[in-house]
Amino acid sequence: MIFAGKAPSNTSTLMKFYSLILYSLLFSFPFLCHPLPLPSYLHHTINLTHSLLAASNPSLANNCWLCISLSSSAYTAVPALQTDRATSPVSLHLQTSFNSPHLYPPEELIYFLDRSIKTSPDISHQQAAALLHTYLKHLSPYINSTPPIFGPLTTQTTIPVAAPLCISRRRPTGIPLGNLSPSRCSFTLHLRSPTTNITETIGAFQLHITDKPSINTDKLKNISSHYCLGRHLPCISLHPWLPSPCSSDCPPRPSSCLLIPSPENNSESLLVDTRRFLIHHENRTSPSTQLPHQSPLQPLTAAALAGSLGVWIQDTPFSTPSHLFTLHLQFCLAQGLFFLCGSSNYMCLPANWTGTCTLVFLTPKIQFANGTEELPVPLMTPTRQKRVIPLIPLMFGLGLSASTIALSTGIAGISTSVMTFRSLSNDFSASITDISQTLSVLQAQVDSLAAVVLQNR
């Protein structure tokens, strides 16, 4: 279903078209449903699209129709820039579980550990609780208390060009998110989930911890690069009981910094730090530069570490290990970026996810047509249109195509067009966040009302 509005400079004229067509659509098709607040969201998106189109291609923006689909599944994905893969921060959302199936936020776990350190009659449990308490304090600067938004935001999303880099992880019992086809990925980085445990002796007992994930390096190139040397900070360790990869005791080596093959563009390259799950972006044109990291958590870090970190304690070498707790690590992208897995989009990766994903900008399906064309407005009763409406995808109007993106890193020449999609993606992400916060407030009010009702029974 298409919403159309002509894009003159007069905003009031646009609103008249909007009101008329939306009114006609809703009464002609009562089954039409959309999860977003249609009037304000679409009006803002249409205005933003027209202003961005006018800035990048004024000849097309002058006297044109802008059309946006009302379907909740009709969205277009554009691969994110290579720099976004190396510099975009992500947030950590941590939950914990004990022998019971309940999950606890980190602040409740810290309270539990404080009590265990002081009151537990078992000295080994006191030591384990003290270690975990230190661990959570170490992670607290990166933990986001805002509830993450899980589940697919959109389905049946199309990506008209191949992404320069995809990330794949296979878990037989994982949460399936979707799989991009090989034709949609120029290069795929494969992650291996841990299948073993690490044993660490702490005083008089042994601690068993879920091992770290790893990166399949078969198709990566060892170019003996020194770009990872001294450039891995900031860095965090999710295994504080082991030597930290961020400490001076474990200096990075050139062999851990591998090149992602990119035959289409030799002026830019992506280097993968396989020990710290970090990506470095290098512009190799003179003078050679490298973008600094804004956060120790990158999209690759999130994809690799999103999982469950289990901890068991063993009092003696011959006793059966007992489960202490499990940390569930979940990560969310910054506003404006999304994980595209198959045809579904996500803002957050759940623990133990499985699939093949890439980073994208996400926008509603927007098309435009020449202002001299007559676009039919749906009547109160559905009628079959006799003429095909000549609509052009916004992507091609901005000069983006498979040939210009070149299936690789070299999209600097069309950065203006990509920035247009970044702005639209930020707009969409902000709307999703606003809706989520509104629903959270409503849920809190419902919970409060339910508590009052129970007290008055």
Curated annotation (Swiss-Prot):
Keyword Transmembrane helix attached: no
Sugar-bearing residue positions: 10, 47, 197, 222, 265, 283, 352, 370
Post-translational modification: Specific enzymatic cleavages in vivo yield the mature SU and TM proteins. The CXXC motif is highly conserved across a broad range of retroviral envelope proteins. It is thought to participate in the formation of a labile disulfide bond possibly with the CX6CC motif present in the transmembrane protein.
Subcellular location: Virion
Domain of life (superkingdom): Eukaryota
InterPro entries recorded: TLV/ENV_coat_polyprotein
Entries under Pfam families matching the protein: TLV_coat
Cleaved signal peptide residues: 1-35
Record motif CXXC, residues: 64-67
UniProt site (Cleavage): 387-388
Region annotation Fusion peptide: where it falls in the sequence: 388-408
Tagged with keyword Transferase: no
Gene3D superfamilies cross-referenced by the UniProt entry: 1.10.287.210
Keywords, alphabetical: Cleavage on pair of basic residues, Disulfide bond, ERV, Glycoprotein, Signal, Transposable element, Viral envelope protein, Virion
SUPFAM superfamilies noted in UniProt: Virus ectodomain (SSF58069)
Function field: Retroviral envelope proteins mediate receptor recognition and membrane fusion during early infection. Endogenous envelope proteins may have kept, lost or modified their original function during evolution. SU mediates receptor recognition.
Note, other: Ortholog of the human HERV-H_2q24.3 envelope protein.
The record's note on its domains: The CKS-17 immunosuppressive domain is present in many retroviral envelope proteins. As a synthetic peptide, it inhibits immune function in vitro and in vivo.
Family statement drawn from the similarity comment of this UniProt entry: Belongs to the gamma type-C retroviral envelope protein family. HERV class-I H env subfamily.
Subunit comment: The surface (SU) and transmembrane (TM) proteins form a heterodimer. SU and TM are attached by noncovalent interactions or by a labile interchain disulfide bond.
Protein name, UniProt field: ERV-H1 provirus ancestral Env polyprotein
